[in-house]
């Protein structure tokens, strides 16, 4: 019984023509994730500090967030994206550097929103670090 010959190499992604989208920047204490989606929320490109080869505590640096944002921005520009709204969420150190990196790639930024969830006295926070 012969199997159908299928190639194992990945298919080339089809180029979408999307002019505007939303960049979701999730900056945690340990990592920074950037997802660029269209207006409906379908992901077009993504990147993170860990995906760029940073490991451990170097993932949480502003430079790692900048490299990740540049990578996600380049991938999104390949699909024809030119204008971005930016949604920043989380308390991490890579928030501003990711924003500046997306500007440097050449996007026209129309809006910046901070969607960090703020508790109205919800769960008890972690204990204060003493170094």
Curated annotation (Swiss-Prot):
One of its GO terms (biological process) is translation. Transmembrane segments: none annotated. One of its GO terms (molecular function) is rRNA binding. PROSITE patterns: RIBOSOMAL_S11. Belongs to the universal ribosomal protein uS11 family. Located on the platform of the 30S subunit, it bridges several disparate RNA helices of the 16S rRNA. Forms part of the Shine-Dalgarno cleft in the 70S ribosome. This is Small ribosomal subunit protein uS11. It comes from Granulibacter bethesdensis (strain ATCC BAA-1260 / CGDNIH1). The lineage of its organism: Bacteria, Pseudomonadati, Pseudomonadota, Alphaproteobacteria, Acetobacterales. The gene is rpsK.
């Amino acid at each position: 019984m012969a199997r159908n010959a299928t190639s194992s190499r990945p298919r080339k992604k089809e180029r979408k023509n999307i002019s505007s989208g939303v960049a979701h920047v999730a900056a945690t204490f340990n990592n920074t994730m950037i997802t660029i989606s269209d207006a409906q929320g379908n992901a077009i490109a993504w990147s993170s500090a860990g995906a760029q080869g940073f490991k451990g505590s170097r993932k949480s640096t502003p430079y790692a967030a900048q490299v990740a944002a540049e990578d996600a921005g380049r991938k999104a520009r390949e699909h024809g994206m030119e204008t971005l709204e930016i949604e920043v969420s989380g308390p991490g150190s890579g928030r501003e550097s990711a924003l500046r990196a997306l500007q440097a790639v050449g996007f026209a930024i129309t809006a910046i929103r901070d969607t960090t969830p703020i508790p109205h006295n919800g769960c008890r926070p972690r204990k204060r670090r003493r170094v």
